[in-house]
Amino acid sequence: MEQLQATFDKLLRETSTTFHRYMYNRINWDARMIGLMGPRGVGKTTLVLQHIKEQLPRKDSLYVQAEDFYFASHRLTELADSFAKMGGKYLFIDEIHKYKDWARELKLIYDYHSELHIMFTGSSVLDIAKGAFDLSRRALMYKIQGLSYREYLELFHGIHFPACTLDQLMQQEVDIPNGFLPLEHFADYLQRGYYPFSDGDIKMYIQQVVNATIETDIPQYADLTVSTARKLKRLLAIIAQSAPFKPNMSQIGGQLEVSRNNIADLCTYLEKAGLIGQLRTSTGGIQGLGKVDKIYLDNPTLIYTLAGKNVEIGTVRETFFFNQTRSLMPVTVSPISDFLIDGKYTFEVGGKKKKQNQLQNIENGYVVKDDIESGYGNIIPLWRFGMLY
């Protein structure tokens, strides 16, 4: 316990509180059990430590990492028992997916220690409703993704810009601060700005995130063999070189020597882990149940990291739009254009010379153009979709 406390103190000292992710003020910190899920490298640990540092008494709090060597000889329930007996009130467990019986033991801690507030973070691959120890009725769950363009501007350039809604974008109600050049940093954001890494070789860091996700997180959750994990990496490479594409599961399965159904499962794991995005057909408003129409890499920064020289700017634009909108609202494939949001707003994404041919006589149709600073009528600048959170 002493070593855990010492590690906790060191992490608190090293935690900066000058910038907060969008999720920081959306979490109901009063809930008895909170789960924060998200891909690797998007700032979950920092967010938790910031909350402790700014809002909680140190003596009442304990932060631990589930992969700490302490848990080689101690159980999570033992730690909670000891912490509660010492008067502890707030227990934070980072990377819970690295602890084997995490769901069962969190349930026991919740049921036996009503005096404790528990927060855990984990890979977005996890499904808390899966299995015998369903936490979905106990934990208030949140999912966080990488930096928006708005957050990138604040973190790396000190430019503060309020978040806006989709309605404000469509109504052209987004005010540009005096002197702000919206395109000045946009290309850099697309290439390297989705993950909050500031020092060193950004591309190397992102490759490490991808490798750890594929080699550790997904196999651990899905109980995959080493051979299947290798095929997962090959599948991601295929997607990186050809996204967006209409998936032919049988053809891909033949390349990887995996059944069609298994390919669909592997794609689902990659999607949950924040490595790809699957654009589906509409199913009467039930998001996530439609047929997969196109597969994208999750975000533009992944494209520049994984696709090498095969970077198509049109793909980058569509990927950015899909990534920034789908975490906030239902996004499906449009039968006449690129994307359909909320089942009623049609969006065509392209460069500044993009025409409106496909949207003629279409109600609620919008053209999203790159390389323009301001919008008019039904034309919206692409960069503004980075202001949604």
Where does each model-flagged region fall?
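Short glycine-rich substrate-engagement loop in P-loop NTPases that contacts/grips substrate
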Residues: 58-90
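Interdomain motor-coupling "hinge/lid" segment immediately C-terminal to the ATP-binding subdomain
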Residues: 2-10, 123, 130-236
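Conserved catalytic cores of phosphodiester-cleaving nucleases, focusing on short active-site segments
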Residues: 321, 325, 339-355
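N-terminal pre-Walker A segment at the start of P-loop NTPase domains
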Residues: 1-26
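Accessory nucleic acid-recognition modules appended to NTPase machines
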Residues: 194-337
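Hydrophobic anchor at the beta1->P-loop junction of P-loop NTPases
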Residues: 36
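Structural recognition of the conserved hydrophobic beta-strand(s) that form the central parallel beta-sheet
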Residues: 92, 117-123
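Conserved lysine of the Walker
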Residues: 44-45
